[in-house]
């Protein structure tokens, strides 16, 4: 890791993942490297061997490196397709392994977006322009009709749209906002006419006009004897610790969107724990110790 970090200190590849609306950085130092210099200093295959856990992840990470190099070599903005939370975690691990800390951003159309693109910035661009790569479509229908996330996703898939071209799907009463790759928006505007048996009226809107549903969470205050995954999962999903251990060992539990088979995996404030069929929750706050030596927790379980 030290060798890779040393070879990338002078490159123009950077990462920026700050909230939208935050102040721009006043200064960036980026020194471009020739392609031959890049190849001589970093072994791409070695980096992928280190970061990828399986063949599918290797393909994903190789694609991300391609986009990164495209931006650097041609000095232009570049972006991946939409990435799931798990894929974003893999991308972050790759960037960390390559010591890339500035010059790119995860963007999904709004602050709490789950599915996001990874945008790489050239040295002349201070801030990511997500609207260059994605747009929003608003589908309206009668309020008396009931449609779900699955209805809209199924309708889009029926049109031959792949999941990586789709961002978040925001369903409200009588309308649904779709965040999509800009290159497929014209096709969807012409071809998406219904979801299920319900007729839709579809129009393009600005990302700033998205109707984002209010986040609904259930607050859980509890204490645990240890900040192990099994203990915290048992608290968040209201089950015994033994049952939580069974879920973990069967591969049904993810810690920060990564499958985790170790019941004793450490959990920290800000971590997200999910289980297939049970939903997910965030460790919103880790408090102090009680008189009995138990750790206080505030959990936000998503509804």
Feature names for model-found ranges:
Residues 1-17:
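Single conserved hydrophobic/aromatic residue that forms the stacking wall/gate
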Residues 16-20, 24-28:
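Basic polycationic patches enriched in arginine
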Residues 32, 41-231, 236, 259, ...:
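Ferredoxin-like alpha/beta domains used as RNA- or RNAP-binding modules
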Residues 12, 26-41:
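Short, Lys/Arg-enriched N-terminal segments with co-localized hydrophobic residues
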Residues 12, 226-277:
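Basic (Lys/Arg-enriched) interaction patch that binds polyanionic ligands
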